[in-house]
């Protein structure tokens, strides 16, 4: 189980994400993280442990204000609780947070390794973000659709590109606020 939050707007994305994650922390307290759009790309900050650890890390970093981002609290399923297994998982052009289980992540990972991708974590989410990256040809939505066509499993995920935030789920019980 995990908590996922995404935000696009005029307020500080970092603060909105942290406030949202605080309300969802009961859904996962093994780790927490955020990905925020910045002028030069996407900045990911994550940590093992409760949300308070992430808050402290973000206070120390004093990042420039962002108006778009995604956040995640994690209850570990694939991979032990650690900084490297924490979400968001990223490539230079895309970052994702994910709740669910990708059943065929092992086979997908082998194909991605054959294409030259490397992996640092033990998570199915890192496989998913690199799969989306491998499908990217300039159009974020098409990359996401192409990647999900290869996936077996359950998912709710927020996908952040520098200029685009997408959300998708295979379930009907999501809560989305506007």
Question: What spans do the regions from the language model cover?
Answer:
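Conserved short alpha-helical segments that host acidic/polar catalytic motifs at enzyme active sites
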Residues: 1-169
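Single conserved hydrophobic/aromatic residue that forms the stacking wall/gate
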Residues: 167-170, 174-178
């Amino acid at each position: 189980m995990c908590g996922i939050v995404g935000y696009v707007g005029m307020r500080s994305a970092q603060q909105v994400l942290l406030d949202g994650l605080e309300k969802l922390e009961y859904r996962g307290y093994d780790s927490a993280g955020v990905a925020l759009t910045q002028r030069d790309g996407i900045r990911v900050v994550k940590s093992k442990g409760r949300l308070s650890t992430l808050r402290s890390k973000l206070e120390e970093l004093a990042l420039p204000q962002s108006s778009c981002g995604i956040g995640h609290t994690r209850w570990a399923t694939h991979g032990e609780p650690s900084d490297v297994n924490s979400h968001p998982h990223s490539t230079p052009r895309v970052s994702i947070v994910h709740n669910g289980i990708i059943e065929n992540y092992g086979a997908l990972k082998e194909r991605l390794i054959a294409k030259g991708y490397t992996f640092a974590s033990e998570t199915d989410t890192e496989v998913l973000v690199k799969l989306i990256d491998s499908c990217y040809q300039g159009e974020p939505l098409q990359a996401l659709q192409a990647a999900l066509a290869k996936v077996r499993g359950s998912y709710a995920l927020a996908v952040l590109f520098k200029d685009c935030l997408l959300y998708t789920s295979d379930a009907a019980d999501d809560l989305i606020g506007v």
